[in-house]
């Protein structure tokens, strides 16, 4: 587990609600709840108690684990070219002693070497289509704009995303994406509140002929996610996506369910929020600030 201070989230709900939505819709992500931390009997604060993504996590959630876990390494670069061995080794979070990234290199090379229908066949072979589409559905509904769908300019014509892991199945040619770090989710649902994270396009749209462009209050450069070889290959499945999206709204992402969850969870942490505000002053939201941000979650989903 890890304890996340949630300094960027004045509602203190983004991680718990976001991971709940992913997990409840069949996407393998960490469990998360709230924790009140005391050190030597003294109250330290309210934290998100979020399951850490590491070897024990993959052992627990992937049929015994054993496969490579990579943090923030995308199989091809933003120009669609394959990655080098050192790149994948640098992202390894399990099996570092062996550092056998040959399967990731093979996947990367196949993505590099193929286009159109052949590319789609490669992606479908290596990534479970239903799970990836479900991941897209939840990611876009909760506006996880600081995650794998946001390709920020790294330098020149190269763009990188972050806040995710890949799990490589040891006995199959398969990879599964695991979203991570959801504290900025939910912010841009109604309007672009965060000056850094907003994504211009819908997940299946492209802008500026797949070249970088400036967007948002800070005018930062980004690149459309659908220009990526993996994400772009799913744009042919928009009807499947829409079907899953409707199911997600019917089952989970609706005001009745969300309000019920927030009512229950906010009652659990109200006193802790107030106590933290008294303890840390301006470094923590006041009870009134917290209530205002909770109200935004009540009214945001659409």
For each feature predicted by the language model, list its residue ranges.
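Middle-to-C-terminal accessory/interaction subdomains
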Residues: 101-150, 154-163, 171-301
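Short, solvent-exposed loop/turn segments at secondary-structure junctions
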Residues: 8, 55, 183-185
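Internal "kinase-insert"/substrate-recognition segments embedded within catalytic cores
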Residues: 5-6, 24-30, 42-147, 176, ...
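Short intrinsically disordered coil segments
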Residues: 1, 62-69, 182, 193-199
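Zn2+-dependent metallopeptidase catalytic core
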Residues: 13-27
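Short, acidic/polar N-cap/turn motifs at the starts of alpha helices
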Residues: 32-34, 163
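Conserved NTP-binding catalytic cores of kinases and kinase-like/nucleotidyltransferase enzymes
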Residues: 1-17
